[in-house]
């Protein structure tokens, strides 16, 4: 039986009525896929895998590698499965789908996402850089006067970004080739810490971020947070429910057309 979870979102993310009806927020990660529609009240959380590949290969097929589409046919099947589940929430057909993509997503990567969504849902996909959505989901003021510093650590990718004026102004990315049942192996932590420290050193002198917020499954690893604090010498904290920060942010952007317009200015 498929590992599918429904996790209720925090009420504050659902207080305001949808600005536009019929949306689906979609966060397809290397290991997990999260989605939520305008007619639902919970996040659907399932493995980023499908069974019964066309080549007859036994076992699950994982369409993504390091956060980007590696198997377009399998990715299409996964998106179809996730989006068709939205029919049960009464949000079908959606007017639009807001989907997260990595900072390093190429035009081909973005096209693969858009093609799959258009074929299944019959509407255009609006693409948002995943760390930007995660910052919104973590409660950061991405349009405030002070830049934000965020590190998103997923199963196949770590992305450290600087957000200023509602857009990502600088970023560093590290592909993660190995994870364990409890997250990153200890030897991989140094690479993530060094990457984030290098990004912080590139920032102008003033104004400085108030600290670093960590999202993604890696935010649950205490050794990572401890090493970041020691190396960066700034406040470091994990977002609430860090694995769901991106999908929360995507939903919030769907409810805030003004903020969405700024966040997606370079992501369509």
Identify the meaning behind each predicted range.
Residues 160-163:
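Amphipathic beta-strand/beta-sheet edge segments enriched in Tyr/Trp
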Residues 1-30, 34-149, 167-212, 216-268:
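Nucleotide/phosphate-binding catalytic cleft detector across ATP-hydrolyzing
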Residues 151-157:
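C-terminal edge-of-domain segments
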């Amino acid at each position: 039986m498929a590992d599918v979870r429904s996790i209720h979102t925090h009420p504050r993310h659902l207080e305001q009525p949808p600005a536009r009806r019929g949306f689906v927020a979609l966060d397809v990660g290397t290991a997990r896929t999260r989605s939520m529609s305008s007619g639902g009240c919970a996040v659907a959380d399932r493995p980023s895998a499908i069974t019964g590949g066309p080549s007859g290969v036994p076992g699950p097929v994982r369409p993504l590698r390091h956060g980007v589409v590696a198997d377009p046919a399998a990715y299409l099947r996964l998106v179809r499965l996730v989006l068709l589940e939205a029919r049960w929430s009464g949000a079908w057909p959606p007017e639009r789908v807001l989907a997260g993509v990595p900072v390093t997503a190429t035009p081909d990567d973005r096209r693969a996402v858009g093609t799959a969504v258009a074929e299944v849902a019959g509407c255009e996909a609006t693409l948002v850089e995943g760390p930007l959505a995660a910052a919104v989901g973590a409660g950061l003021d991405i349009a405030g006067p002070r830049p934000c510093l965020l590190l998103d650590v997923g199963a196949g990718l770590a992305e450290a970004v600087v957000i200023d004026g509602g857009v990502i102004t600088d970023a560093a990315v590290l592909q993660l080739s190995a994870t364990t049942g409890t997250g990153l192996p200890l030897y991989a932590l140094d690479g993530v810490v060094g990457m984030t420290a290098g990004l912080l050193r590139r920032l102008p002198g003033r104004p400085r971020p108030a600290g670093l917020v960590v999202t993604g499954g890696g935010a649950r690893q205490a050794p990572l947070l401890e090493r970041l604090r020691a190396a960066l010498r700034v406040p470091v904290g994990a977002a609430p429910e860090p694995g769901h920060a991106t999908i929360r942010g995507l939903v919030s952007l769907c409810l805030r057309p003004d903020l969405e317009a700024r966040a997606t200015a370079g992501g369509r």
